[in-house]
Regions:
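A short, structured surface patch at a secondary-structure boundary
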Residues: 65-114
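Extracytoplasmic substrate-binding proteins
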Residues: 140-214, 312-328
Length: 328
């Protein structure tokens, strides 16, 4: 009997031990996560290559206005922006830079010392003219330069702009906010198209210009089909009159009055700064006054603050202003 009891006791101990192993927490038996599975790690691709960060970044210095706008579009305030005064003058959007945002010089020549004082997590700009600054900026923090100059980016500036928005959103952990902003723009284009069609305009062909005076001489930036502006207006049901130009790096050609005459049988949609006397100076210009869109009252003001090189918030301003101008 004593032997039987001893055997039963040994069997019970073995059974309890097996059950304890079965109930062990999963993290004691699971494989260790690989480096690629590290929680929170972010890899983004910019115009120069890949960058890996340990998670969403918080202190961002935007040395290009588009970057500042992209951050605002996803609900993030940059630590600093180049030429804040210029941004506020030229970029009319429904989000504002906070008063705490530091001005760090010009886009073409950022103040390196001021940026260093801010101890940013990342400095974000664009390829092209800002690449020359890379060696100095990289001494301060990692630098991301969004693609703006590749053949692919130039061929479709609208698509490139959305890609750059998504990159910035990924950098700060705001991907859902970026997609919501893109959807909002697409919905507004469709809504505006319906309203413009109902307006029964004389034509749906357009020329869009950012015009300005240079030494009292009028100059017109005419936006080509590869531009963000053209894509948005075509999304509103309009057709770009300019079809005879190659893709330009910034999506426009520069013309004088004689150059504009090549596209005169169209809606002439313009953005001009309020303090620019351009149209006043043109009032006595016979060549200007004889243009089809002048004679037939087909000139439409898109407002003075449309940033024609902007991101989704500028697109919304463009849609709203053009829709109002064409349908009132």
């Amino acid at each position: 009997m004593k032997k039987i009891l001893i055997l039963i006791a040994l069997f019970t101990l073995i059974l309890v031990g097996c059950m304890a192993q079965d109930d062990a927490p999963a993290d004691q038996t699971a494989e260790e996560p690989t480096e690629d599975q590290t929680v929170g790690e972010i890899t983004i691709v910019d115009g120069l290559g890949e960058h890996t960060f340990d998670g969403p970044q918080e202190r961002i210095v935007a040395i290009e206005w588009n970057v500042a706008e992209e951050l605002l579009a996803v609900g993030v305030q940059p630590v600093a922006v180049t030429d804040v005064e210029g941004f506020n003058k030229w970029v009319t959007i429904d989000q504002a830079l906070d008063e705490s945002v530091v001005d760090v010089g010009l886009r073409q020549e950022p103040n390196i010392e001021e940026i260093a004082k801010l101890e940013p997590d990342v400095i974000v700009g664009v390829t092209g003219y800002q690449e020359a600054m890379l060696p100095e900026l990289e001494k301060i923090a990692p630098v991301v330069l969004l693609d703006s100059q590749s053949e692919e980016a130039i061929a479709d500036i609208y698509a490139s702009t959305l890609n750059n928005l998504r990159t910035v959103a990924q950098l700060v952990g705001k991907e859902q906010e970026a997609e919501a902003a893109i959807t909002r723009v697409e919905d507004r284009m469709a809504e505006a198209q319906a309203n413009i069609e109902a307006a029964d305009l004389a034509t749906l062909e357009f020329v869009f210009t950012q015009a300005y005076s240079s030494n009292d001489v009028p100059e017109f930036r005419l936006f080509t089909p590869n531009s963000m502006v053209s894509h948005v207006l075509e999304g509103m049901g309009l057709t770009n009159k300019i079809q005879d130009q190659e893709d330009e790096a910034y999506g426009f050609i520069t013309a004088n009055v004689e150059g504009v005459a090549n596209y005169q049988e169209a809606l002439f949609i313009h953005t001009v700064q309020l303090d620019d006397p351009l149209f006043e100076n043109l009032s006595s210009n016979s060549a200007w006054n004889s243009l089809h869109f002048v004679e037939n009252d087909l000139m439409f003001d898109a407002g003075s603050g449309v940033w024609t090189f902007g991101s989704v918030l500028s697109m919304e301003t463009l849609i709203n202003n053009v829709e109002e101008a064409l349908t009132k």
